[in-house]
Every structure is written in C-alpha cells, then in structure tokens.
C-alpha cells in the first residue's frame, strides 16, 4: 500500500496555503470537497488551477497532463465544449492527505444535447493543502432536457439544493 509520501516533493508558490490542510478529518474533507465543487462551478480555469500544485499531475478520462498551465488549457477546452456546466461533488472516503469523491455534472453541447456525466476522483494533497495528484474516471450519459436535475442559476450550487445522495444519483 502506498504511503502519504508516495510522490516526490511538489513545487508550490512560497506561502501558498489552501485550507483546510491535511491530515483530514471528516469535516475538513467535506469542506475541501465543497470548496472544490464551488470553484469548478465558477468555470474559471485560472481560478480552478490555483488549487493545484505548480506540477500537479492529472489523469482525466484517458488524458494525462501536468502543471497549472496544462490544467488551464484543459479546462478552457472543456468548458468551451461543455456548456451550462453544473456540478455536484460528494465525499466518498478520506485518509490523511487523500480524499476520494464521487460526482455528477450536467451540461449540454453546442447542438443542444444534454448530458449527465458521472465520475469518481482520487485526490492527493501536499502539506499546504494544494492538490498534487488528481485521477478522474468519468462516463457521459445523454439525457433529455426534461430529465435534468440541476436547474440552479450558473455558478455555485445553492446551500439548500440537494446533494447527490439526496437526488438518488
């Protein structure tokens, strides 16, 4: 089994902290997940990238990338294609500096076809709370517009909106 120090030291900007910091307890891990959901729902690639180490390594589906610049480029492409993106994340498990989440997001393409994308992510954080490793597996399901479950205005999910488990997803 890999230890929490399974990767080499990561490069971060001096003094750059992203609380809550590891090691995570249930409350800290749940806060970290909601903060990640909120920033991804901003659909601002540069803002999202600040939560990752300078040399963060990602696997997103079958695409591999490394570093904040690559993250910004990837997210710019993603949100050019995935329109009206709305995301909900849910804590699945945590241990020390690692968090596992499940998520679902809804979006439409430029032809008007709606999708719900389901996935799981494994995250590993450095001591400053920046994510240094992200592994995401995602599947897209075409849905009818009438089957959408996420109808809040674009941006942060309202606090009173149901989560994944509450929605039966």
Positions of PLM-derived features:
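A beta-strand edge to alpha-helix "cap/lid" segment located at domain peripheries
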Residues: 2-24, 73-169
């Amino acid at each position: 089994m890999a230890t929490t120090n399974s990767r080499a030291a990561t490069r971060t900007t001096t003094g750059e902290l992203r609380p809550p910091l590891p090691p995570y307890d249930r409350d800290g891990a749940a806060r970290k997940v909601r903060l990640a959901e909120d920033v991804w729902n901003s659909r601002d690639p540069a803002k999202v990238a600040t939560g990752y180490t300078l040399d963060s390594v990602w696997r997103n589906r079958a695409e591999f990338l490394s570093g904040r610049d690559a993250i910004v480029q990837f997210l710019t492409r993603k949100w050019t294609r995935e329109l009206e993106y709305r995301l909900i994340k849910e804590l699945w498990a945590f241990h020390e500096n690692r968090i596992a989440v499940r998520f679902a997001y809804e979006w439409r393409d430029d032809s008007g076809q709606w999708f719900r994308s389901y996935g799981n992510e494994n995250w590993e954080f450095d001591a400053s709370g920046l994510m240094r490793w992200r592994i995401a597996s995602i599947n897209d399901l075409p849905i009818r517009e009438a089957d959408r479950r996420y109808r809040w205005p674009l941006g942060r999910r309202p606090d009173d909106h149901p989560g994944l488990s509450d929605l039966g997803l």
